[in-house]
């Protein structure tokens, strides 16, 4: 039997042996049914299998999907039209790192326009988990590969924030599913300020076209622009109209520029070409990050 070359999601309920999730299987729906979009699960990476279960220790971790998740609404006729190589993929595992500076700013990167999935969309640095890697090691490796930031586990504090069920394209109106992931969001707290970290930033232009540091006030505005809702997004009057960003040229040269805050508050379009925005999964992770700040303030 050919060795599996990717880490895949496996599911377990009620102490049953973990089974490899199917590409068309709703991971969130497996635990909460079709009506709900969020579950609380256990997760572990064992023998190159990412196992999600319903036996909770230490409260479990949140798992969420978009209200418009394509897997949730895929019809039987659409499902049978998918190519066999897509159907046989299983559900991949990704990791994304929310790097928090000592002055409580988060690093986001804009995906290069040449990337196959989610081009020009703002996300935390991240990528696939490789064989025999731990989640944190995978996150640190991806951070280094995409941004040039070389952090060792002993100089940061880390915690798992939550899990996001990601499907690309993100809506059926845009196209049938080609990729299905569970993204693990890990919070990394650095003892350096964002300016100190910025001095070491060397983004890979094949992956990243811009970087930005966001604070809690801006993040609150970003997450208020809930994807799938129709109401007009209200940007608080006390926020600046634009924010400073570091652009990355195709040859890797960095330059300072500005970006309208309204771009970061864009919603995912219902159809047609995607637009520059913060990804839906990232908004979920940013909401979880805000809760950690609130908890820290309460403890303080």
Swiss-Prot record:
A motif (Nudix box) lies at residues 127-148. GO terms for biological process: NAD catabolic process; NADH metabolic process; NADP catabolic process. Its cofactor is Mg(2+); Mn(2+). It catalyses: a 5'-end (N(7)-methyl 5'-triphosphoguanosine)-ribonucleoside in mRNA + H2O = N(7)-methyl-GDP + a 5'-end phospho-ribonucleoside in mRNA + 2 H(+). Mg(2+) binds at residues 142, 146. InterPro entries: NAD-cap_RNA_hydrolase_NudC, NUDIX_hydrolase-like_dom_sf, NUDIX_hydrolase_dom, Nudt17_dom. Keywords: Hydrolase, Magnesium, Manganese, Metal-binding. The keyword Aminoacyl-tRNA synthetase does not apply. GO terms for cellular component: peroxisome. It comes from the Eukaryota. Residues 88-239 form the Nudix hydrolase domain. GO terms for molecular function: metal ion binding; NADH pyrophosphatase activity. Its EC number is 3.6.1.62. CDD domains: NUDIX_Nudt17 (cd04694). Coiled coil: none annotated. Belongs to the Nudix hydrolase family. Acts as a decapping enzyme capable of hydrolyzing monomethylated capped RNAs (in vitro). Hydrolyzes monomethylated capped RNA after alpha and beta phosphates to form N(7)-methyl-GDP. Shows low activity towards unmethylated capped RNA. This is m7GpppN-mRNA hydrolase NUDT17. The lineage of its organism: Eukaryota, Metazoa, Chordata, Craniata, Vertebrata. The gene is nudt17.
